Regions:
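Short, solvent-exposed aromatic-acidic interface loops
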Residues: 6-9, 80-84
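N-terminal strand-loop-strand
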Residues: 1-14
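Short, catalytically relevant binding-site loops at active-site mouths
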Residues: 9-10, 18-19, 96
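A short helix-to-beta-strand connector/capping loop
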Residues: 43, 84-86
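Surface-exposed, interaction-prone regions with an acidic/low-complexity signature
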Residues: 100
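Surface-exposed beta-strand edges and their flanking turn/coil or helix-capping segments
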Residues: 15-19, 26-28, 75-78, 103-104, ...
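The catalytic Nudix box helix
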Residues: 13-48
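Active-site-adjacent beta-strand/loop module that shapes the phosphate/pyrophosphate-binding cleft
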Residues: 52-77, 86-95, 105-120
Length: 121
């Protein structure tokens, strides 16, 4: 699973807001992926599910994006919050992130694990 180290806020998943101009959750996910990671070529994208995060009344929508030829790790300078360097890496879905991430990201990772266990991914 693609994660990144935010310089101020620990380990996170690519996420963001569905804007009024987004045609779908898939469109929003692809836009956020490009804005936060620099990944602009998505081979395919599939909506997985919605999830009540329990954090600030946020509903999250999981989208699986298939991309080709990505590095094992890279840094991308995003314009989010005035500009940050996000350090991206591939994370073993079974490994814990509890000491390095906000609980909402820990719970999101658990949700993805359940989707995999149920054959949804």
């Amino acid at each position: 699973m693609l994660l990144f180290q935010h310089p101020l806020a620990g380990i996170q998943l690519v996420k963001g807001t569905v804007e009024t101009f987004d045609e779908s959750y898939i469109t929003a996910a692809k836009r956020e992926l490009a804005e936060e990671s620099g990944i602009t070529h998505v081979i395919s994208a599939r909506y997985l599910c919605s999830w009540d995060s329990g954090f600030q009344n946020q509903a999250w929508h999981f989208v699986l994006c298939e991309c080709a030829d990505l590095e094992d790790s890279w840094t991308f300078h995003t314009k989010d919050d005035g500009g940050h360097d996000f350090a991206f890496f591939w994370h073993d879905i079974g490994s814990d992130i509890s000491s390095q991430a906000h609980t909402v990201f820990q719970h999101a990772l658990e949700k993805v694990r359940k989707l995999i266990d149920q054959g949804g991914v």
